[in-house]
Amino acid sequence: MASGTFVSRGLGLVRNVLLVAAIGTTGLVADAFDVANKIPNVLFAILAGGVLNAVLVPQIVRAYRARNTQERLDKLLTLSGVILLALSALLTAGSSILVALYTGPGWTAPQTSLAVAFAFWCTPQLFFYGLYTLLGQVLNARGQFGPFMWAPVLNNVVSIAGFAAFIALYGPAVTGNVDDLTQWDGTKIALLAGTATLGVAAQALILVVPLWRAGFRWHLRFGLHGIGLRSAGQVALWTFAAVILEQVGVLFTTRFASEAPRAALAQTFGAYRDDPGTLGAVTGLVTGAPDAFSGALAVAGNAAYTQALMIYLLPHSLVTVSIATALFTGMSAAAHAGDLARVRHDLSRGVRTVGVFTVFATAVLVVLALPVTKLLVPSVDAASGEAVSMVLRAMALGLVPLGGMVLMKWVYYAFEDGRTVFWIQVPGTLVLVGVSWLGTQLLPPQLWVVGIGLAMSLSNLVAVGLRTVGLRRTLHGLDGARILRLHVKAGLAALVSAVAGWGVLRAFVVLSGDPADGIYGLSWWQSVVVVAVAGTVMGLVYAGGLKLMRVRELDQLAGPIVGRVRRLVRR
């Protein structure tokens, strides 16, 4: 699973590089597309993602233990598919309303219209994300985890081809006219946004192949009787409410982030919203003198936030999601059987193994934020790279609690306990929105999105703390001493490795001969060298520290990788 995720994320980075090359990371079009492409992801999380994970997996596990397995699966998949299709059609028709929810009053009419056009093409992704989850969970319940993790590879291949075609036809963002909104006709919009949706469709439909080969046939079968939804109704409602609450936080932070560039520009250049013409002063500055104003225009907004979030989630998706997916089906079965010891053991093992990786990943992202940003987003300029990297550092502080938070949430789902998930989400959302809003009041607009990143980290910490308290009661203990001891040891090793990585960065600044510019002016190739050298040094120091402190979880995490490398060498 991790190897599939690794390849997928690698191609995802290539996809992202081409997207940034096409429309940039800051500016009118970048923010408009980011809002539109975020909508189906948010909608899926609200309307399907959480409910499907909370309800579908336990019911599929039960279906495979029942005598009428095929009938139950057919009814579950048919009901879910019909609901997804109807919601997708309805929400696509309401694209303009959705865009209005996620944008602030500072958006001009032309930019809002462009975002609505993008959203009309992007919102149907909701159906295909749902279909991907439905088919993938059937495969997972059968013990076939690989296809679910490899399917996004096809998504990225399709997107890479489409974005490359866009650049070939219309040129890259660096030509300086990407934010000329009068140039965005229907064909140009369809190629960019339609490519994103086509990739998600391919990701979902490819899962039909492994299911067919495994002998599974899905027949349309309507009906609610005998599929366990009566027992799942409560958890579905509570989970739905929890996800709604979570996405309220996303709604507010998106609006805060969308206003940051305009607030910074108004602060620097004065009022511009009522300027005559279709482009406005912001576009005039970008197209007329992009070099002169690049520093002032490179204020982190929605697009920069998304770039930082993409990098931040790489270690999470590579390790945490893979481990959680592998453990969830077994934990659901153990919870159904009342085997608390098995659930407690699996959760402890998952949190400790994930912690070994996320503690180190936090150190790397904090120390190497700027070179990592320039490595993974090669087309970003110096000012935009600095804006993204500052947000990334703030987010990275919440990476460790994020891993534990996700694993613990899935334990609640295994017990079909949506009520507790909801009530724990309340203070988490309040912290996220409250601290983000406080940042807009106390910080300059250039740092609003950094404040959102810090708020997100603090929210993760609050959520994992509350879930720990709740699960300690549910499982009659959490193996807390071992978990805490592991994280303390990993934290000490990561601190030493961070100092070593910082030393490598300082050495590079001295050797570069330009202390004034230093890391800020790194080229892509220099970023490759810095990340490779500093990352290797940090990794060796970290692994050495864990070995000295006899942290066995390192072997559990690295064992499969080492074993595969050895087999390849022997061949």
PLM features: what roles do these ranges have?
Residues 1-571:
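Membrane-embedded alpha-helical bundles of multi-pass transporters/translocases
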